[in-house]
């Protein structure tokens, strides 16, 4: 576990960070409530404030932006046709939810790969479509910033990789 001082040294006010399901957030500062210390984030997606308890921020999926190498690796995952796509939608749903919970860009790319390929065979059920859209959005958002590309340009890259499957 990181101590409060380690975490506060790790994230600077104004820094962009990724917080699992919220995606891209801006670090706004520290707050203390009821004796617990929190990192205050601003969600760029829905313009809301998010408090992350410092004691388990990492387990909750708070992380720094990925490196260019990590983004490139995630983009490579998009064209990996050897990744399994389960027939049983409940198994697929649980696996993809677990992958999304890890919050890593690799995991997000695996979800995009799996559900994109599945959608080419059969329309996705509503819950899976929502996970797919969320994963795609997270991938695009982080890749755009790290690689310095706009959304339209990044979508072209992502879908050309997916189409190569």
Language-model regions: role of each:
Residues 57-165:
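Charge/polar-rich, low-complexity and marginally structured segments
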Residues 1-62:
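A positional/architectural concept
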